[in-house]
């Protein structure tokens, strides 16, 4: 099994316009919603390639069911630690010149109790995993050192992969990744 840990899921809202005119009314040509997060994308990719994925991480009460529906459609089993609030939304505006403008949400804060629950979940699930992938950003209020705590909680037999940058990556490297 390949376990993926998503700490900050997001709804990507891609809006195509003839041109993006700041301060004016713009007409949408097309709009696409994607229920993502780097680790969830990994799990979906593993499923599409015929592998054995399992997704876990943090999810939010108000709109998390849309992520469950998307993972069900892709054949990805999952267990999430549920939090109050909404999944963050990232907006991508594409104009007819193929210029991309992004506006990314920071999302909801997560309590220390919930991050502790996730540590326990990762410890349990990683014992059944050949590979464990932690990928993406952290929710507001969760320090970069949490990446290291996750890797230290993992079963020593699982192959540990971090897809991160900056302080999160250094925290994972200090904890030991493969």
Indicate residue ranges for each PLM-predicted region.
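Glycine-rich phosphate/adenosyl-contacting loop at the front of the ribokinase-like
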Residues: 1-56, 65
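Conserved N-terminal subdomain of the carbohydrate kinase-like
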Residues: 48-129
């Amino acid at each position: 099994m390949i376990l993926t840990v998503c700490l900050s899921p997001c709804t990507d809202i891609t809006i195509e316009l003839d041109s993006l005119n700041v301060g004016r009314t713009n007409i949408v040509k097309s709009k696409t919603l994607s229920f993502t997060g780097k680790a969830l994308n990994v799990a979906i990719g593993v499923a599409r390639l015929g592998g054995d994925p399992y997704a876990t991480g943090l999810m939010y009460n108000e709109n998390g069911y849309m992520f469950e529906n998307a993972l069900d459609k892709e054949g990805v089993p999952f267990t999430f630690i549920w939090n109050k609030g909404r999944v963050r939304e990232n907006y991508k505006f594409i104009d007819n010149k193929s210029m991309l403008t992004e506006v990314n949400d920071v999302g909801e804060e997560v309590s220390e109790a919930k991050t502790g629950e996730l540590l326990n979940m990762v410890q349990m699930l990683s014992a059944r995993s050949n590979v464990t992938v932690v990928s993406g950003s952290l929710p507001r209020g969760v320090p970069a050192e949490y990446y290291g705590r996750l890797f230290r909680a993992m079963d020593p037999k699982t192959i540990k992969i971090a897809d991160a940058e900056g302080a999160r990556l250094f925290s994972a490297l200090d904890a030991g990744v493969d």
